[in-house]
Amino acid sequence: MSPDLKKLKELRERTNSGLLDCKNALEATDNDIEKAIKWLQENGIIKAAKKSARIAAEGITKAYIKDNVAVLFELNAETDFVARNQLFIDLANKIQDALAANDFSDIEAANKVKIDGMTIEESCQDLTAKIGEKITLRRAEKFVAKPGEVVAGYTHANSRVADIAIAKGANQEALRHVTMHIAALNPSHLFESCLPKAQHDEIVNRINSDPKLANKPEKIQESMKAGMLKKEFNELGVLMFQPFVMEDSKTVAKYLEENQLTLLDATRYEVGEGIEKKVVDFAAEVAEQMKQ
């Protein structure tokens, strides 16, 4: 049976699928729109599976705050162009709402959270089939503030860097300023205690035996040691010792103290970090596309 032109147009508009795919779907389902959509979904999963070996290293990362919940996630695509596609943005917005409303312990559990009757993983596969690029939820983090705690987050304008934080206290605006600092300076560690013990011990021992301390009164020695440790930990990128980006006359630790905040945890994502991007032979890629 030849496809009905009106139904062909409707199917394309509802699914954003290609003309030939829609034609085949209608022919296979006797021009039944709903069955044709299901046919496209079933065949779309196959197409998505063929794309599973591709590397998705572009995309967005978002921080989302709702009441006492902070969610951070990275949604990947293969190209920056697709990451600006409205369908991709719509999916990201649905994911943020779903992750905020549901518990998850790791990325596998996050991908099983449901939106619109499908898991996040299935929704990514569905969008992969529609736009032709591999879409994946790569990672996600969630902080839930207890009474006496506060959460905050920051997403940079290009959505390539975002972070969330949780602290004891109530000043959310001040904590948000700290998340802006974290996004900008990308500290290597949050606290001195986060440094590997061997590295920390080496620094302390080296400073304690510094010749400049010789013959100095004890109080002056302690002051000099504190200054040298502060300088060393700042150079190593420890957040608490970094000059606060909005007021560099004080450290982040001092800024938090002034605002009655005690930082508990923070997480920062940058799109594609840790992913090895594949260098593609364009001629080979074209040849491969011609086989499909």
Curated annotation (Swiss-Prot):
GO terms for cellular component: cytoplasm. The lineage of its organism: Bacteria, Bacillati, Mycoplasmatota, Mycoplasmoidales, Metamycoplasmataceae. Keywords: Cytoplasm, Elongation factor, Protein biosynthesis. Residues 79-82 are annotated as: Involved in Mg(2+) ion dislocation from EF-Tu. One of its GO terms (molecular function) is translation elongation factor activity. It comes from Metamycoplasma arthritidis (strain 158L3-1). The keyword Protein biosynthesis applies. It is found in: Cytoplasm. Belongs to the EF-Ts family. Pfam families: EF_TS. CDD domains: UBA_EF-Ts. NCBIfam families: tsf. This is Elongation factor Ts. InterPro entries: EF-Ts_dimer_sf (IPR036402), Transl_elong_EFTs/EF1B (IPR001816), Transl_elong_EFTs/EF1B_dimer (IPR014039), Transl_elong_Ts_CS (IPR018101), UBA-like_sf (IPR009060). Associates with the EF-Tu.GDP complex and induces the exchange of GDP to GTP. It remains bound to the aminoacyl-tRNA.EF-Tu.GTP complex up to the GTP hydrolysis stage on the ribosome.
